[in-house]
UniProtKB/Swiss-Prot annotation:
This is Probable CoA ligase CCL12. GO terms for cellular component: cytosol. The keyword Ligase applies. Pfam families: AMP-binding, AMP-binding_C. One of its GO terms (molecular function) is CoA-ligase activity. Residues 499-558 are annotated as: SBD2. It comes from Humulus lupulus (European hop). It is an enzyme of class 6 (ligase). Keywords: ATP-binding, Cytoplasm, Ligase, Nucleotide-binding. ATP binds at residues 360-368, 498-503, 591, 603-606, 703. Both substrate-binding domains (SBD1 and SBD2) are involved in the substrate recognition, and are sufficient to confer the substrate specificity. Its EC number is 6.2.1.-. It is found in: Cytoplasm, Cytosol. Belongs to the ATP-dependent AMP-binding enzyme family.
C-alpha cells in the first residue's frame, strides 16, 4: 500500500495527536500483514474498527485508496471491502440452509457456507424443485390446497415453468397470520413508522394482530363496494394505510393496480385505462420535505371512475371531492359499525391467479403492464431471504413506493420472512429520515444510488448512529464506488448488497451475498436458481468464468417470472430473436454485463446504451465512470453518441451536471474528458461536445432518459448546421 504519513492524516481531517495515534495503529496493521494481500490489510483495518462513522469521509477515502493503490483491477477484479467470517456465514439464512442440507445435496464436496456457496448455487440452478422445496419451508406460506408438485416443466407454453401447480392460497393472508416458523406472534411488531416533522416523537408500532384487523376492516369495506376480480388502483405514498389497502385488496380477491405517486395525470390515466381500474385510492396532498403537494387534483385530471381519498394527516380532507368520490372516513364507516367488521374470510385462489398489475417505467412508448400472480411474492421474498438475509428480528426499511416494483418486494419480503417493515412518512432526503433509521433500529436499509449521493453531499446524516444496520441494499441504477464507500462506512463497513433485476422477474437476477466477499458497485453472484450466460456480438455465449462483456441471456426456467403481458406480446418482448443455448431459448433482459477477474459482475447499462465510436462498441456507463472522476467540479455525467447531420461516424457528447457552488467551462471539460477517456479506455476516443446542464431528465423511478438527451443534441446540431 502507499505510505500514509501524519501530514496526510491531518489533511484528511484528524488533529495532530489523533493522526499520530492513527498512524501507529496503521503501521502495526501493515507490519503484521507484511507480504500479505492488500485485501488482508483492509480486512484488518475494518476488523479493528480503526475507521469510524464519525471520521471525515476524506480519511476513509485516503485509507481505502492507499491500501489498494497498487491493486491491479484488470487481473484481480474490483478491490474487496467486506469479508464474511465463517462464524457470521453460518448465522445467515443461506448459511444455515447449507449447514443443514449441504452434505445431503452435495455429498463430500460440501465444506462450509463460504467455500461451498458456488456449488450450492449451481445445485439450485440444476435442481430448482429440490431448492424450492427447502426454501418455501423458511417462509410463512400456508396453502389451503397443497401443490401437486414443486415444479412442472411439461407445459412448454410456460417457459418459466409452473411452480406449485394445483396449490390454492391467499398470499396476503400468509403475511398476516401468526406462525411458529418463522416465529411471528400476534404481538410481534409488523410495522414501525414515523411522520415527517415528528422527529423527536416515539416511533409508532403496529403489531401483527393490529395490522390484520385493519386489513380485514378494509377488506369488508371493499366487498361492500366492488365485485371479485375488479382492478383497484393505489396512487399514494407508501404509508401504513397504503400497505393496509394493498393487502386488503389482495386478501379480498381483487387486483391491485400500482401507480407511483409522482406521475402526472396523463401517466395515471394511461395506467387506469390499460388496467381497466374500477377505482383508485389516493391522498388529498403529499407532505414531503416540509412542503405540500397536491395529489388528488392530479388523479382527478386522469378521470378515474371513483376515488377513495385519504387525508395526508388528521381525519379531515383539505379539499372538496367530486360527486362520485368518497372520503376514507366514509368508506370505512360503511362497515365499521357492523358486527365482526375486523374479521374476514380470505378469498382463496390458485397460485397463478392475478393479484397485482405493475408497470415498466416506460422510457419509451406505452409502459408494459406486468401481471404479478401469487407466485411473484414467493419469488421476491425467497430472494430477499437468501441474498439480503431478511429474518425474524430484522427491521427492514427501503424508501420506495407501491407504484414501483420495490414497494411490493419490500412488503412481501418483510412479512413473509418475519421481519418488521419500517416506513417513514416523508422525504428520505433529510436528517429526519436518518433519525428514523436510527430510532427505529433499522437493521436492513435499502437505497438507490442517487439517494446515497444526496446524503453524502449534503452531510445531512452527520451525528446519527446507524450501527445497528447489518446490511445495506442498493438497486435502480449503477452505484458509485465513492458513494458506496461513504454509505458502508456509516455502519463500520457493513456490506452493500447490489441488486439488479426487473418487475417482470419479480426479483433480481444478479445480486450480492453474505457468504461471499463484496466489492463496491459490483455483483458477486447470479441469484439463487438463476442460470445466465453472457453473449458475444454474434449471440454466442462466452465460456463460464471467462472475463467478458456482452448482453446477458437468462435461462428460460425462471420461477416467478411473468409469462404474459397485459398490453404486449410476452414472447416477442422477451424471447423473439434470442439465441438457443443447450436447446433452450434464452430470455432477454437487455442488460450489458461485464464479468470481471475475480468473478464479479458489473452492469454496463442497457443494450441500447452502447455506442459505436470509430467502429468500436463501448458502453456509455464505462465512459461516464471515467468522466465522473476527471474533474472535481463534476457531480455526474451522461454520455450519448450522435451521428453528424451530414452523416459519418458517431460523435461522443458529454452532458454534465456540476456540483453545487462549482463553475466550469465546457471547452475545458471537453479536454479533460478526452484525456481521461484516452488514458483509461481507448486512445482513439475523443469527446466532440460538452454541454453543461442543471439536471438530467429522468423517469419517476429515476431511470435516466438518455434518449431525451440524444434527441436534444440532434436538434442542436441540426440548428447549428443551418447557421
Amino acid at each position: 500500500m502507499c505510505e500514509v504519513g501524519v501530514e496526510d492524516l491531518v489533511k484528511a481531517g484528524l488533529s495532530t495527536e489523533e493522526a499520530k495515534y492513527f498512524q501507529r495503529v496503521l503501521e502495526d496493521i501493515v507490519n503484521g500483514a507484511k507480504g500479505l494481500d492488500p485485501s488482508e490489510v483492509w480486512r484488518e483495518v475494518v476488523a479493528r474498527r480503526l475507521l469510524k462513522p464519525s471520521h471525515p469521509h476524506e480519511l476513509h477515502q485516503l485509507l481505502y485508496h492507499s491500501v489498494y493503490a497498487n491493486w491491479d483491477v484488470s487481473t484481480r477484479g474490483p478491490p474487496l471491502y467486506w469479508f464474511p467470517s465463517l462464524h457470521q456465514s453460518k448465522k445467515t439464512n443461506l448459511g444455515r440452509l447449507m449447514e443443514k442440507y449441504g452434505s445431503e445435496v452435495l455429498g463430500p464436496l460440501y465444506k462450509d457456507p463460504i467455500t461451498s456457496f458456488s456449488l450450492f448455487r449451481k445445485f439450485s440452478v440444476q435442481q430448482p424443485e429440490a431448492y424450492w422445496s427447502i426454501v418455501l419451508k423458511e417462509l410463512s406460506v400456508s396453502f389451503q390446497e397443497a401443490p401437486k408438485c414443486i415444479l412442472d416443466s411439461a407445459d412448454k407454453s410456460k417457459r418459466s415453468g409452473s411452480l406449485l401447480p394445483g396449490s390454492v392460497l391467499n398470499i396476503a393472508e400468509c403475511c398476516l397470520l401468526p406462525t411458529s416458523y418463522p416465529m411471528k406472534r400476534d404481538d410481534s411488531p409488523a410495522i414501525v413508522w414515523r411522520d415527517e416533522g415528528y422527529d423527536d416523537s416515539e416511533v409508532n408500532v403496529l403489531t401483527l394482530k393490529e395490522l390484520r384487523e385493519k386489513v380485514m376492516l378494509v377488506a369488508n369495506a371493499l366487498d361492500a363496494m366492488f365485485s371479485k376480480g375488479d382492478a383497484i388502483a393505489i396512487d399514494m405514498p407508501m404509508t401504513v394505510n397504503a400497505v393496509v389497502i394493498y393487502l386488503a385488496i389482495i386478501l379480498s380477491g381483487f387486483v391491485v393496480v400500482s401507480i407511483a405517486d409522482s406521475f402526472a395525470a396523463k401517466e395515471i390515466a394511461t395506467r387506469l385505462r390499460v388496467s381497466n381500474a374500477k377505482a383508485i385510492f389516493t391522498q388529498d396532498f403529499i407532505l414531503r420535505g416540509g412542503r405540500k403537494f397536491s395529489l388528488y387534483s392530479r388523479v382527478v385530471d386522469a378521470a378515474p371512475h371513483k376515488a377513495i381519498v385519504l387525508p395526508v394527516n388528521g381525519s379531515n380532507l383539505g379539499l372538496q371531492l367530486r360527486e362520485q368520490d368518497i372520503s376514507w372516513e366514509k368508506f370505512i364507516s360503511n362497515v365499521s359499525n357492523q358486527a365482526r367488521s375486523n374479521h374476514y374470510t380470505p378469498f382463496y385462489q390458485p397460485v397463478d391467479s392475478l393479484i397485482n398489475i405493475l408497470f415498466s417505467s416506460g422510457t419509451t412508448g406505452e409502459p408494459k403492464a406486468i401481471p404479478w400472480t401469487q407466485l411473484s411474492p414467493l419469488r421476491c421474498a425467497a430472494d430477499t431471504w437468501a441474498h439480503i438475509d431478511a429474518q425474524v428480528g430484522d427491521v427492514f426499511c427501503w424508501p420506495t413506493n407501491l407504484g414501483w416494483v420495490m414497494g411490493p418486494v419490500l412488503l412481501f419480503s418483510s412479512f413473509l420472512s418475519g421481519a418488521t417493515l419500517a416506513l417513514y412518512h416523508g422525504s428520505p432526503l433529510g436528517h429526519g429520515f436518518g433519525k428514523f433509521v436510527q430510532d427505529s433500529g433499522v437493521t436492513i436499509l435499502g437505497t438507490v444510488p442517487s439517494l446515497v449521493k444526496a446524503w453524502k453531499n449534503t452531510q445531512c446524516m452527520k451525528g446519527l448512529d446507524w450501527t445497528k444496520i447489518k446490511v445495506f441494499a442498493s438497486t435502480g441504477e449503477a452505484s458509485n464506488v465513492d458513494d458506496d464507500l461513504w454509505l458502508s462506512s456509516q455502519a463500520y463497513y457493513q456490506p452493500i448488497i447490489e441488486c439488479c433485476g426487473g418487475t417482470e422477474l419479480a426479483s433480481s437476477y444478479i445480486q450480492g451475498s453474505l457468504v461471499q466477499p463484496q466489492a463496491f458497485g459490483a455483483f458477486s453472484t447470479a441469484a439463487m436458481t438463476v442460470g445466465l450466460v453472457i453473449l458475444d456480438e454474434n449471440g454466442i455465449p462466452y465460456p463460464d468464468k471467462q472475463e467478458c462483456t456482452g448482453e446477458v441471456g437468462l435461462f428460460p426456467l425462471y420461477l416467478g417470472a411473468t409469462d404474459r403481458l397485459l398490453n404486449a406480446d410476452n414472447e416477442k418482448v422477451y424471447f423473439k430473436g434470442m439465441p438457443l443455448y443447450n436447446g433452450m431459448s434464452l430470455r432477454r433482459h437487455g442488460d450489458i454485463l461485464k464479468r470481471t477477474a475475480g468473478g464479479f459482475f458489473i452492469v454496463h447499462g442497457r443494450a441500447d446504451d452502447t455506442m459505436n465510436l470509430g467502429g468500436i462498441k463501448t458502453s456509455s456507463i464505462e465512459i461516464e465512470r471515467v468522466c465522473n472522476r476527471a474533474d472535481e467540479s463534476v457531480m455526474e455525467t451522461t454520455a450519448v453518441s450522435v451521428a453528424p447531420v451530414s452523416g459519418g461516424p458517431e460523435q461522443l457528447v458529454m452532458f454534465v451536471v456540476l456540483k453545487s457552488g462549482h463553475n466550469n467551462e465546457a471547452e475545458r471539460l471537453k479536454k479533460k474528458f478526452s484525456k481521461a477517456i484516452q488514458s483509461n479506455l481507448n486512445p482513439l476516443f475523443k469527446v466532440s461536445f460538452v454541454k453543461i446542464v442543471e439536471e438530467f431528465p429522468r423517469t419517476a423511478s429515476n431511470k435516466l432518459l438518455r434518449r431525451v438527451l440524444r434527441d436534444q443534441m440532434k436538434h442542436e446540431l441540426l440548428v447549428r448546421s443551418k447557421i
